[in-house]
């Protein structure tokens, strides 16, 4: 039976009903009464069960609250104990400090007996007496200078004080104005000085930029000259090899003339490293000269007349050509290593080579027949090569 179902009606029986009513009707009413009692009992049991669960839940909550409160109480008790301990420690420290600050009679006697403290107290007494004397003098002076409002001296003194105060204020204004003007002048000077510094800094920056450009140009020229020096050294080694081979093949005077011409060409190559094309042309001209010299050697090999005269003359010419060749090499290296003086060295060496060439042209060449013709052809070839090299330079 649930709460939603209606309760059965209550049956009431009297003694008269027991006597009057038949048995069947009594049984029926009795059953109704039993049903009513059963419904009440069920309802009571339901109510009891709900109350028990609620009471149990409330009991658990109360127990938990009691545990929490007990835990808090323990924590608070511990805190209280720690606070009391701290209070006791503080009181002991305060008592100790009081005992330390309150010296004993023995300490006071010891301090009074100390001579340094005695001297200190004597000085303090002397200073106190001096201050008292000064105070008395000041009070006496103040009482002497006192005057009534109607006294003429007091009025004059006040007027003088006002005038002095005004003069002091005016002097302060003048000093402040003069200081401001001085500061303005100094500020103008500093501005002018800063502008001059800025202009000088700009000039220095421009000068530094120019120097950087010049340095870059000089570095590029140095690199070019170093490359040309390397090329000239390679060409020089080639010419030396050619000279050695020609010296081994031709011990006659034509080999000496060839050495001189090749030395001149090498000197001109070293004197003019600024043009790569000219060095190439010079190598071709020297090779042509070498070929012409070899042809003249073949022509002169058949003439037995001048065999005795050739060795001495050729030795002299080769020694001269070798010395001039070494001088030209040294001057050429110096001119290439120093880029600033390359132009002067070029002009100087070109003049030297021209003078040597002219002096060698003036010397007579001993020979007959085909030898004189070949030497003339050789000199004409040298002249043409020198003219070509001069035009290139």
Curated annotation (Swiss-Prot):
- Mark out the compositionally biased spans (Basic and acidic residues): 254-267, 310-319, 354-365
Subunit notes for this chain?
Component of the WMM complex, a N6-methyltransferase complex composed of a catalytic subcomplex, named MAC, and of an associated subcomplex, named MACOM. Component of the MACOM subcomplex.
Name the source's superkingdom: Eukaryota
Q: Where is the composition biased (Polar residues)?
A: 272-286, 320-353, 369-393
Which GO biological process entries does UniProt record here? mRNA modification; mRNA processing; regulation of alternative mRNA splicing, via spliceosome; RNA splicing
The entry's keywords: Cell cycle, Developmental protein, mRNA processing, mRNA splicing, Nucleus
Its annotated function is as follows: Associated component of the WMM complex, a complex that mediates N6-methyladenosine (m6A) methylation of RNAs, a modification that plays a role in the efficiency of mRNA splicing and RNA processing.
Provide the coiled-coil residue spans.
Answer: none
Per the record, the similarity remark reads: Belongs to the fl(2)d family.
Localization in the cell: Nucleus speckle; Nucleus, Nucleoplasm
Q: What is this protein called?
A: Pre-mRNA-splicing regulator WTAP
Provide the species name: Xenopus tropicalis (Western clawed frog)
